[in-house]
From Swiss-Prot:
Gene3D superfamilies: Ribosomal protein L33 (2.20.28.120). The gene is rpl33. It comes from the Eukaryota. It comes from Aethionema cordifolium. HAMAP family: Ribosomal_bL33 (MF_00294). The keyword Plastid applies. InterPro entries: Ribosomal_bL33 (IPR001705), Ribosomal_bL33_CS (IPR018264), Ribosomal_bL33_sf (IPR038584), Ribosomal_zn-bd (IPR011332). GO terms for molecular function: structural constituent of ribosome. Keywords: Chloroplast, Plastid, Ribonucleoprotein, Ribosomal protein. This is Large ribosomal subunit protein bL33c. Belongs to the bacterial ribosomal protein bL33 family. PANTHER family: 50S RIBOSOMAL PROTEIN L33, CHLOROPLASTIC (PTHR43168), LARGE RIBOSOMAL SUBUNIT PROTEIN BL33C (PTHR43168:SF2).
Length: 66
């Protein structure tokens, strides 16, 4: 039986370097990935190194609010 809320939630990961450089308008957009995380194992914000097609390199992608 499930207890309360779902343990696994869907989150969005956004490129942190594109967000910072968006003010300068150097890149065409902001890279976002959709994934899931377990709330019990990782209660804090998730940060992963993923490939950003706008920066053309691997950067840190941080969890954002929906």
């Amino acid at each position: 039986m499930a207890k309360g809320k779902d343990v696994r939630v869907t989150i969005f990961l956004e490129c942190t370097s594109c967000v910072r450089n968006d003010i300068k308008k150097e890149f065409a957009g902001i890279s976002r990935y959709i994934t899931q995380k377990n709330r019990h194992n990782t209660p804090s914000r998730l940060e992963l190194r993923k490939f950003c097609p706008y920066c053309y390199k691997h950067t840190i992608h941080g969890e954002i609010k929906k």
